[in-house]
């Protein structure tokens, strides 16, 4: 007996028509399918696409998401990665305003497409600037000759997004996505855990979620002044307390008070 999660992983790694179809290739296939559905659609955001869906779908044929954290582009002396969690603000309230199942379904689909679109804005930037990135990162080739991207999505669904990337560009990548979401009408908050590649992933993810929640607390405090986007980050290393509050109490507090915005 195996769980359905294990079954899906095994299916994703099996040969298909003599060609290995790993999970990262399926991720790219999903993105390409969404890009095809976006092609020719009217765009209602405050700014037009910064990319052409058909061209990006074609360009992605030459690239692959790394399946190992060590292949995100880190150098030996800078072996840090980042776990990024981004979440839309007040989405529950927005869905409650949809008083029929049809409206909720349409809104859910619209939010999903906007989330994918924002991620594709970043991918287009990365591909367009790939030669420059290679000067600062160690970006390898996959066995099939495709070039590894310095990022890998973990969750892309609804207003929720989690990805891993090289630490050097974590803030820039997150800013690009949050600005794209904002242009698409979704203000959001984000949390970034910066950690050694060998650091336990689940701990980094938990802290990234807590950082996003801390950013949302600031957003809610400023709510009367209108919508806003907030980002919080932390650098993790060695043995540290299990919660963000404990980490900051231990490392970012002094006799004169705290040394962070929280």
Residue ranges of each PLM-predicted region?
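Regulatory and interdomain segments flanking nucleotide-handling catalytic cores
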Residues: 1-262
């Amino acid at each position: 007996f195996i769980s359905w999660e294990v079954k899906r992983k095994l299916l994703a790694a099996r040969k298909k028509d003599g060609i290995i179809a790993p999970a990262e290739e399926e991720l790219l296939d999903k993105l390409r399918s969404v890009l095809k559905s976006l092609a020719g659609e009217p765009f209602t955001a405050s700014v037009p696409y910064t990319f052409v869906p058909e061209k990006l779908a074609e360009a992605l044929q030459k690239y692959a998401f790394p399946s190992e954290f060590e292949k995100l582009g880190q150098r030996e002396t800078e072996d840090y990665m980042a776990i990024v969690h981004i979440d839309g603000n007040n989405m529950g309230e927005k869905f409650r305003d949809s008083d029929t199942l049809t409206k909720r379904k349409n809104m859910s689909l619209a939010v999903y497409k906007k989330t994918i679109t924002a991620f594709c804005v970043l991918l287009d930037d990365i591909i367009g600037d790939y030669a420059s990135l290679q000067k600062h990162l160690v970006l390898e080739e996959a066995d099939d000759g495709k070039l590894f991207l310095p990022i890998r999505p973990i969750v892309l669904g609804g207003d929720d997004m989690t990805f891993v990337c090289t630490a050097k560009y974590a803030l820039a990548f997150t800013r690009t996505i949050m600005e794209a979401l904002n242009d698409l009408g979704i203000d959001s908050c984000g949390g970034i855990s910066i950690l050694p590649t060998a650091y336990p992933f689940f701990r980094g993810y938990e802290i990234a979620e807590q950082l996003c929640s801390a950013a949302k607390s600031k957003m809610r405090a400023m709510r009367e002044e209108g919508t806003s986007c907030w980002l919080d980050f932390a650098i993790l290393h060695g043995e540290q307390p299990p919660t963000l509050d404990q980490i900051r109490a231990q490392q970012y507090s002094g006799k004169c008070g705290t040394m962070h915005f929280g």
